[in-house]
């Protein structure tokens, strides 16, 4: 029986490249001349720290970062940015977390979405991924389109497509 896995992963090397590109653009931007502003990637806990002298500039830096991530093939929804920025002394910063894996509540939501669609496929949760099996390849492609089209707030990839 054909099957595939639904996962949510971010290529950390591409994130590192995007952060480097954003830092390079930051050096050439006229509106950031003489301003203390940085991007810092923490590989261990998969966060990106965006630091600047004002909250408005932090928003500008986040826009630059999102644009660079998008150019590298990483969707903006994979970046979880808190609403409140932290003010410390003369700097403002925010720790944006990269979404890795699918949380159990989201897994249940996806499984329910697939079951409610009346497609002839079965879905089961396996760790941080969801295995979807069906009798025909067309049903599986319908399930893929359903997950892509459902506004779930997180990017998903499809792996291990087997016939």
Curated annotation (Swiss-Prot):
Task: List the GO terms this entry assigns under cellular component, sorted alphabetically.
Answer: cytosol
Q: Does the keyword Metal-binding apply?
A: no
Keyword annotations for this protein?
A: Nucleotide-binding
Q: Which SUPFAM superfamilies match?
A: YajQ-like (SSF89963)
Q: Which GO terms describe its molecular function?
A: nucleotide binding
* One protein family per Pfam: DUF520
Which InterPro entries has this protein been placed in? DUF520, UPF0234-like_C, UPF0234_N, YajQ-like_sf
What this protein is reported to do is described as: Nucleotide-binding protein.
HAMAP family annotated for this entry?
YajQ
Recorded family membership? Belongs to the YajQ family.
- Protein name per Swiss-Prot or TrEMBL: Nucleotide-binding protein Ent638_0893
Q: What is the lineage of its organism?
A: Bacteria, Pseudomonadati, Pseudomonadota, Gammaproteobacteria, Enterobacterales
């Amino acid at each position: 029986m054909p099957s595939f896995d639904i996962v949510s992963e971010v290529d950390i090397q591409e994130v590192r490249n995007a952060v480097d590109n954003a830092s390079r653009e930051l050096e050439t931007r006229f509106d950031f001349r003489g301003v203390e502003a940085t991007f810092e990637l923490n590989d261990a806990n998969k966060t990106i720290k965006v630091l600047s002298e004002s909250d408005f500039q932090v928003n500008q830096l986040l826009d630059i970062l999102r644009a660079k991530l998008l150019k590298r093939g990483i969707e903006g929804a994979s970046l979880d940015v808190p609403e409140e920025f932290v003010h410390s002394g003369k700097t403002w910063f925010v720790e944006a977390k990269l979404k890795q894996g699918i949380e159990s509540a989201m897994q249940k939501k996806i499984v329910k979405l697939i079951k409610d669609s009346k497609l002839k496929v079965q879905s089961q949760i396996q760790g941080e991924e969801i295995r979807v099996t069906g009798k025909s390849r067309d049903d599986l492609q319908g399930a893929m389109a359903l997950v892509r089209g459902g506004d779930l707030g997180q990017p998903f990839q499809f792996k291990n497509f087997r016939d």
